[in-house]
Amino acid sequence: MAESPGCCSVWARCLHCLYSCHWRKCPRERMQTSKCDCIWFGLLFLTFLLSLSWLYIGLVLLNDLHNFNEFLFRRWGHWMDWSLAFLLVISLLVTYASLLLVLALLLRLCRQPLHLHSLHKVLLLLIMLLVAAGLVGLDIQWQQEWHSLRVSLQATAPFLHIGAAAGIALLAWPVADTFYRIHRRGPKILLLLLFFGVVLVIYLAPLCISSPCIMEPRDLPPKPGLVGHRGAPMLAPENTLMSLRKTAECGATVFETDVMVSSDGVPFLMHDEHLSRTTNVASVFPTRITAHSSDFSWTELKRLNAGSWFLERRPFWGAKPLAGPDQKEAESQTVPALEELLEEAAALNLSIMFDLRRPPQNHTYYDTFVIQTLETVLNARVPQAMVFWLPDEDRANVQRRAPGMRQIYGRQGGNRTERPQFLNLPYQDLPLLDIKALHKDNVSVNLFVVNKPWLFSLLWCAGVDSVTTNDCQLLQQMRYPIWLITPQTYLIIWVITNCVSTMLLLWTFLLQRRFVKKRGKTGLETAVLLTRINNFMME
């Protein structure tokens, strides 16, 4: 569709130069936007939406990114916190797509052609491929993160609605401009139907929004208790006695850890199947780096340092570096035995919850690792009530021999003959839980792993009893959810947002109509003047 030359101001020409990389003024025959240019504009808009969606996904995934770091370490053997690099790359993609889209919209308003340069086209295709690869990888390797996104919408949907209403008001400018330039009735009606169909969906979206943080303040449940995930891993090396003490200082009530059984039958604290991430096994036993953690004897495990790695690698981005006494204490940490942990926890008035890792098949205690661990707990002479027993293996025997221990059940079930009193589930299961009904049945719910204030606030509003976290010092400082609004207030916000957006839409279309009439009148006057000049010269 041919277009008039439009404004020839320096500003418009600069915009055109940035978009098309043509620094010379376009000849009159090129002052038009072809169908191919329109297709590339559509791809640009799609790329912007994809990159913006990926940014949102990335911000949500920051809560679980430590698992991604550990996954890559197990694959590559090199530790790196990918949080900063991840955010930087996504931010660059969104910034580039946003600037290019703004240039295109401004050029459209200035009636300049949308001749996208080949370099921009290649970069847009690369961004689309990169985002698509990220989404496919997420679906293959971490499908549970789709459930994380579903949970996040309960916290962000009210604000996304406001942002969408503002975005559609801005998008109305080029839509109205295009509408008044189209002369055929069919395409004009189709454009209006598509645009206002999207507007209607956005305006009515709050009808589908359900968030536990939309409630009366008087109905806010008590703040969830804190469970230290492997202790306080942002303040001390994970699964160490120092981490246990830092957990108590954070105000947490439970220390969550991982237990393995050594080759000579001593239960000890360790999460990974190999010792290379959290100990100096490479320097002490260089030929056994890939050996299973349970294949080491307790005498060998006591020779390992379990704290120096924490000072060298800084496993969590944003965590403050240790200094002074804390640094010296971290440097001297060793692999603790379960018996040591129980005695220290009893002195600190902390409860213990642990996962029990099955040893390899050729292990001496492959069939009896549960009994070996239970014997250690019973011989420690600590109150049984301070132990939360999580493993499902041989649970009936454990209940019979240690009836005072609190049995906590996970997603995989457990004892079918007894109603559970404690549930330990991933936070992604929140939409599947009826917290109020569980509380009526005297069932306590702990969700893991919760590191970000937005997620903690959401679970607080939902009435969760406790959360397992890596960042107990941050969550301890929270005195109130990040946001909490009453249903009446949210209704007012919804109505005001839609009304303001509607007025902006109407104003935009009326203003664009006025501009079109003004341009038409100016063009008619110019044509009359040129005709008179031409007639005068012919005389």
Curated annotation (Swiss-Prot):
UniProt cross-references to Pfam families, sorted A to Z: GDPD, GDPD_2
Enzyme Commission number(s) from the entry: 3.1.4.43
Residue ranges constituting the GP-PDE domain according to the UniProt record: 224-479
Residues that bind a divalent metal cation: 256, 258, 271
Spans within the Cytoplasmic topological domain: 1-38, 107-121, 176-188, 512-539
GO MF terms held by the record: glycerophosphodiester phosphodiesterase activity; glycerophosphoinositol inositolphosphodiesterase activity; metal ion binding
Top-level class of the enzyme under EC nomenclature: hydrolase
Keyword Aminoacyl-tRNA synthetase in annotation: no
Annotated glycosylation sites: 442
Keywords: Cell membrane, Cytoplasm, Cytoskeleton, Glycoprotein, Hydrolase, Membrane, Metal-binding, Transmembrane, Transmembrane helix
Record's catalysed reaction(s): sn-glycero-3-phospho-1D-myo-inositol + H2O = 1D-myo-inositol 1-phosphate + glycerol + H(+)
GO cellular component entries: actin filament; cytoplasm; lamellipodium; plasma membrane
TM region(s), chain numbering: 39-59, 86-106, 122-142, 155-175, 189-209, 491-511
Annotated Gene3D superfamilies: Phosphatidylinositol (PI) phosphodiesterase
Protein role: Has glycerophosphoinositol inositolphosphodiesterase activity and specifically hydrolyzes glycerophosphoinositol, with no activity for other substrates such as glycerophosphoinositol 4-phosphate, glycerophosphocholine, glycerophosphoethanolamine, and glycerophosphoserine. Accelerates the program of osteoblast differentiation and growth. May play a role in remodeling of the actin cytoskeleton.
Name of the protein described by the UniProt record: Glycerophosphoinositol inositolphosphodiesterase GDPD2
Organism this protein belongs to: Homo sapiens (Human)
